[in-house]
Amino acid sequence: MNNPEDAKLVTLATSTLARSGAEQAAALRDSTGRTYVAVNVTSPSLNLDAFEAVLTVALASGISGIESVVATGSRPANVKAIKDFAPTATVFFVAASGEVI
């Protein structure tokens, strides 16, 4: 990861995970440089992984494109949700060890 803006997303995602106590957290940077964070939501009637949740938050804010997304915690399964909206977006996962995948 060579982009310092992506490193900021790592910080946002890991701090959101630590603060929330959720299983997953994700941080997204849109094409204008604005950032969004979200965690997974799990209940009997609703299941969103962190990718789905952060995409929902960003879309509700009126984004027109995605540059990069970082997730941490347990690995979200639905990277396709991001790639469907922004096929060229960079998507990273940060393992508990700190390794960027």
Per-range role (PLM):
Residues 1-21, 56, 61-101:
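C-terminal binding/interaction regions
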Residues 24-34:
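Short beta-strand scaffold segments in enzyme catalytic cores
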Residues 28, 47-48, 69, 97:
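Residue-level detector of alpha-helical recognition elements and their boundaries
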Residues 43-59:
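A short, polar/charged loop-to-alpha-helix boundary motif
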